Amino acid sequence: IRDRPTPVVGVLGVMEDVEKAIPHALPSADEQYTLILLGETKDEFGGSVWQDISGAGLAGLPPQVDLANEARLAEFFAGNAAGIAAAHDLSEGGLSQAVFELLLGSDKGAELNLEGVHADAFTALFSESASRVLVAVTSDRAEAAVERATSAGILVTVLGETTNDGVLRVAGEEVQMLE
């Protein structure tokens, strides 16, 4: 049991058709997907999972929420949900955890390039910057998704593609995925 206070914000809404909900994991092993990061990655580790497990203790400021980008993301998803195969937040564990959870159970791997995410690979993988979403779109819809997000004013980074070998590769290096 943690002894640190945790502020919790809850949001409740009504979804008219639950069949239109975007899953947080890949829905089909038969498709090829392009993985895209929406939003800016910053050097923000205050209160993060990494900070907690590294023994550094929880300290510093939490990631700053970009309300303007949150609004742009909400508009993007409201108007484009049909083209998104899966989406995952990056709030707990950063990009590394989001990619793992997206792939889990799909028998898919991925080939990722982090160059456009952040200059520092560690920050790119583990930062918990707010106002970011990892999305998977079928590869034939990737260009259209990038165009829609860019025209909505959202920073877009194409990370790479899924593979059928079940292996995650980051910058050409294999990453062991353990359940």
Where are these regions (language model features)?
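Glycine-rich anion-binding loops of enzyme active sites
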Residues: I1-G46, E161
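Glycine-/charge-enriched secondary-structure boundary and capping motifs
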Residues: I1-V8, L12, A59, A74-E179
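C-terminal transmembrane module of polytopic alpha-helical membrane proteins
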Residues: V65-L73
